[in-house]
């Protein structure tokens, strides 16, 4: 559980900083990849933290989702990992499935902010996150219909 506490602390440092730090994002990614067996808890921490942030920090939170999803997708591809959403122990593939489950809520939250700068950044992240997931075409269409 110490790893999950480190993950949450590092995540908060990343999203509350004035600028994204590559070294902190790398540290966050390393902690997450070592803790994939706790996929549900990782996604819960990510989502809960995102929802609690002021609008200005939510874009950094989406960048964290993006970085972690890319790293998980890389592991899935390299190692041929498969995931069963109902398995007791998580892995990179089940992490992606669980992140996919909260994506709609993330995008709805960002769209509700109604900030033009946020929408431009969100459109960039939609493209990146689409590359990490399968079967999110409806979500992408929803997001694109609200973006510039």
Segments from the language model and where they lie:
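Eukaryote-specific intrinsically disordered, low-complexity regulatory regions enriched
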Residues: 1-148
């Amino acid at each position: 559980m110490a790893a999950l506490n480190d993950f949450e602390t590092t995540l908060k440092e990343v999203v509350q900083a004035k600028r994204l730090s590559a070294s902190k994002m790398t540290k966050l990614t390393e902690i997450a990849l070592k803790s994939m067996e706790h996929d549900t808890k990782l996604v819960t921490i990510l989502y809960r933290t995102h929802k609690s942030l002021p609008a200005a920090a939510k874009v950094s939170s989406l960048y964290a989702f993006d970085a972690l999803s890319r790293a998980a997708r890389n592991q899935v591809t390299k190692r041929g990992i498969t995931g069963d959403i109902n398995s007791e122990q998580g892995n990179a593939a089940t992490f992606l499935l669980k992140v996919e489950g909260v994506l709609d809520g993330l995008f709805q939250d960002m769209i509700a902010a109604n900030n033009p700068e946020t929408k431009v950044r969100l459109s960039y992240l939609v493209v990146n996150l689409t590359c990490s997931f399968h079967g999110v075409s409806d979500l992408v269409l929803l997001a694109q219909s609200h973006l510039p």
